[in-house]
Amino acid sequence: MDLIDEEKFSSEILDVYKKFVVMKQEAPDSMKVNLFTTIRNFAKDLISNKIFIEAFVLYRFLIVKSELIPDDYSTIAENLVKINAPKLAKNFMTIYATKEQNKVLMFLTLANFYNLQIGDYRKAIKYYEKYVEIDKTKAVIYSILGNLYSKVYGDSSISEQIFYFEKAYKLNPTSRLVLHALAFAYEKNRNQDKADKFYKEILNNNPTEIDYYNYGSFLISCGNFVQGHKYFRYRFLIDDENLKYPIDNSFSKKWDLVSDISDKTLLVHYEQGFGDTFMYCRFIPLLKKFARKIIFVVQDNLFDLIKNSPIISDGIEVLSDKTSVRNIYYDYDMALLDAPFVLKTTTTSIPYPQGYLTVNAPEVKTYASKYLKNKSNLKIGIAYSGDKNANYSGRDIDLKKFNIITNLENVNVYSLQVGSEIENPKIIDLGNTFNDFTDTACAIKNMDIVISTDNVILNLAGALGVKTLGLFNKQTNFRWFKTTGENVGWYNSVKPLQACVQDDWTTVFPQVVNILSEYHS
């Protein structure tokens, strides 16, 4: 009652409280039952309208004048959380658990309380699991359990997620949420057949543009480039800033990617990040057979490097994105990442896996004389952090994990990372010497080997044909369809090393050291 400011408090509710708080215990039972029911319903109406303090005043009346029913304790607890009294709320839920005789209802109420009100997801899992031991008929509860395991334990709980989502699927096989969950979980679990089954069920169940895009990405990750890139075209129909068509629709002249344009000028525009441009620019020369002329627009930081790489630029007009597309004459345009669809590329027909970008030897030599140390030591370039704005995370490695490499004898370790602070004095920072990607390429060409988890450096090193160890998390970006063997499929010079557990690199770095030791032998 100390919370009440009578000037601001609802006079109607205060009058009800004052009128009935003096009611005698010996009042007729029928009167008390009717009154308590009315008060209880009134309190719930107030709560539904988020009028919490007034509702608690009425519950106080019930506490004083009647014996609360179990539902009262849980209702009070849930709404104490809303006025920032979680400790008191938990006390009421403890009392509720002793009062509620219906075990199924009790476990569900406790589970929902800890899940939705407190955010103690581990406790929520405990009570939901007790619930499904008794009632095995609710698909939504199994689905909640699958999602909670994902939220609390991440990819280490894939088996539990699949177990509960499969239970939900058996009870409700048309639930799009469950189908999505199973497709994603099986994809993460490397069970491509099962993932494909559920993706196909999604596409037969009121599919959206993002469903087609997700399926396309999945197929690409499986190495099914032809079908994957067909569905991948749906990305531009999704409301996602990272997936926008690279040319403004108000003046774009989109090619449908199939009609004859042999007598036309085709403008190919980069999309997404630097790594994507490095990876996909290899397709530009092959597009010459489709159009009379090809114009290739790239990010300004990449312009000099690509312009001066003959495999890509011979017979191609390469332009910086500083040039407004409005001022370029052309007939049709397309996005760079659609090139594999146009070319019907397969994993065995990826062009130029040996490399296709070049820098002039004198520039490479000049860079070395300026910035590199003992030339007789093994020169190792490292990149350990990905773009924070990219669609995919999981590419960051604590720089301290590279100490096992910097402690090796007769090595010089160079950071190729831009804008990072390096505390290890054994790591030489080259990032602040990079004005554009020609500088980065010169640094990479001077390395005996590059070790990278960052897509930009990984793709650039591969495109330059430099020996590289690609460090891949357990969950990788869909473009990397091959993460075993001696190369990644895209580049002959890039050897993949993959974590067995997401974000756990303990098995990867010993492999790195073993490979580096071969260079000393």
Question: Where do the PLM segments sit?
Answer:
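Alpha-helical solenoid repeat scaffolds of the TPR/TPR-like class and their adjacent stem/linker regions
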Residues: 1-449, 454-521
